[in-house]
Amino acid sequence: MDEQVIFTSNTAGTVATLHSLEQSSLRQCQTESKFSSCVVKQKYLFVAQSRKALIQVYDLHGSNKRESVEQRLPVPEVLQALECVDEDGLLLGATDSGKLYIWQLASGNLLNVKPMAHYQGIVKIKSICHGKYIVTAGSDSRLIFWQTMDLVQKDEPKPLFIIHDHSLPVTDFIFSNTLGHSLDGKLYTVSKDMSLRCYQVSVDHEPTCIATFTFPSSLNCVSLDTADRAIYVGTDTGVIQIPLYYKVSNSKIINLLQPNESKIYSITEITPGAMEPDLSSREKLFSIGQILCARIVHNNTTSVATSLDGSLLVSGDSTGKCTVTEIFSNQPLKEIRALSTNDSTGPVSNLIVFPVTQQSESLLDVTKIVKPWKFPNLQRAIVDRKHGINDVYVQFHENSVHNVLPVSDFDSYLDTVASEEHIFHQTGSINSTVNRVGQTKASMTATAKESKVSSDDDIYKSKDKQIAQLNGTVASLTDAYKELRKMHEDLMKEHQQLLSKNGTQTEN
């Protein structure tokens, strides 16, 4: 299993892999706003174009993948944030004026429009809890929780929670990996006010701020370790690692996110090349609210993400390249640049890292070319809810598992495996023969038929023997049962006689 790295900039889009050298370029991909792209059904990439009311669709996987644009979807106005809810088949788009659009992907219907979801432009949209809730962050320094059903069904949906602790625009946020079907976990937000805030989120009460981290510069992005052990914050000077389990002394490790009390910590960066302070000075600094943190990347970071196992950090900078860094050693492993003739393609605006599973079709007898799926055009007018029923377009693919040899014809599969084993079997110490399976296909078929007939005769003979054995067993069991029944009746008679004798003696 490999991991795919997708990043875009002002004039280029690139698709690369984390553990190999494979790389391709997305043609005609131009987007300047952050979080303006999303992956749909782990196969397609939606990119909202800058200064154009248009969404471009790219096919990332399968036999139909290519670098050119697969489909263009016009939208009512220019979008600067996108999010897809795969569980519900919804596409959400946001504008610079704070308007929120909700489309149904299978039909293209515009389900609802929230004109003033935020007072200013929406920066990021995130679907959580398997599509139950939608979280939006805006330049108005607010972060709002919505229920997905309210956004779809109600004309005037009301927010579930509103967080407005930041004093400047929110630039990014991320939820803890422990967040599952229910709304119960931690939320991390970063802002231009040079602060990182951690909230305890629950559906039963308002989000509670449990920790605040202050920095010497504004914050651009945030990512979280896969095991919730550390936070990676991207700033104008690089990426800073904040360990959530902070070592104060040899025998003392403190959890910085205590749910019972809200604390404010000041981040003090460890200077590269300088000696790390001893534990006594660390304890003194911690007592006055200062935390020593290391800087992993030293470039102006605009986007950051972690690998699946949490060992690698992918950071996009202002020059348009992505750097893969090993977190443990703080050593850069490789740099990924856009395939462009320009020296710089602009800052990295979108960065997506997700695992990719390659599907092999080597066992298929016949490989059919499937036409690429086309998404319906996104409507500009809100659908009338009074009808209640709308057309949904779905493409059903033929199940290719039935074409695989073990499932389609198991006997032929066994014969094929036996012939392959015979081909590679060494009959002597020196001589060996190699044959082609395709040349012996006819002989294998005839041999398979003969072996099938002989095997059927053997099966019938063995069944007759088993039936005779079972009949003999039943007869012997019947005789034994009769003998036991006779013995039981004799014993009962003797018992009755003894009882009668004892009764006569007691009467006398």
Swiss-Prot record:
Compartment(s) where it occurs, according to its Swiss-Prot or TrEMBL record: Nucleus
Start-end of each WD repeat: 74-113, 117-156, 214-255, 289-326
Main location: nucleus
Protein's UniProt keywords contain Repeat: yes
InterPro entries for the chain: WD40/YVTN_repeat-like_dom_sf, WD40_repeat_dom_sf, WD40_rpt, WDR18/Ipi3/RID3
Alphabetical UniProt keywords: Nucleus, Repeat, Ribosome biogenesis, rRNA processing, WD repeat
SMART domains: WD40 (SM00320)
UniProt-listed GO biological process terms: DNA-templated DNA replication; rRNA processing
Keyword Repeat attached: yes
The family this protein is said to belong to: Belongs to the WD repeat IPI3/WDR18 family.
Role noted for this protein: Component of the RIX1 complex required for processing of ITS2 sequences from 35S pre-rRNA.
Assembly and binders: Component of the RIX1 complex, composed of IPI1, RIX1/IPI2 and IPI3 in a 1:2:2 stoichiometry. The complex interacts (via RIX1) with MDN1 (via its hexameric AAA ATPase ring) and the pre-60S ribosome particles.
PANTHER family: WD REPEAT-CONTAINING PROTEIN 18, WD-REPEAT PROTEIN 18
Name of the molecule in the record: Pre-rRNA-processing protein IPI3
Organism: Kluyveromyces lactis (strain ATCC 8585 / CBS 2359 / DSM 70799 / NBRC 1267 / NRRL Y-1140 / WM37)
Lineage: Eukaryota, Fungi, Dikarya, Ascomycota, Saccharomycotina
